[in-house]
């Protein structure tokens, strides 16, 4: 896993301190949420979203702030997203490529999110289960590879979708050592 993440993230990932193996990506997402949020914190969730995201936020004691993605391209409104960040969330959940709508966020969209995450000191929890299921002309960009984002990104994924082994429940987190250690 560390070799894979190192290759795709363009940085050396330490398998002993920056990878956490989980029982599927659902556990990875919940562990990430519980690591960086406390009861009463707020978490931004793009909508529509995979059914667990809102529940994960609520179960961790956080309050979800829903930001709509508008069809047909499922783009977000930059002003609405910044308004959500102005509520000082502790984290944002980013599913890229998105489940259920299939949106692949562009580099410029990710950079906009990254700039807000840095400005408002917000963690970004990514669900990148569909990272290798992307069709041209789209291109998946790992959020953690954006300038300044490694330190505040918890990248969650699994082997289920790409390798068609959903029953094996093999998930993982790739995160900076201080965060991975808490998980």
Regions found by a protein language model. Name each.
Residues 15, 34-94, 107:
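PLP-dependent aminotransferase-like
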Residues 146-183:
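Conserved core segment of the aminotransferase class I/II
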Residues 22, 65-67, 156:
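Hydrophobic residues at beta-strand termini and immediately following loops
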Residues 41, 62, 119-123, 149-151:
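A short helix->loop->beta-strand "cap" motif at the edges of active sites that frequently abuts
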Residues 70-136:
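Active-site phosphate-binding strand-loop segment of PLP-dependent enzymes
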Residues 2-42:
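Phosphate-binding glycine-rich loop
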Residues 12-13, 144-148:
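Short, conserved catalytic or adaptor-binding loops enriched in Gly and charged residues
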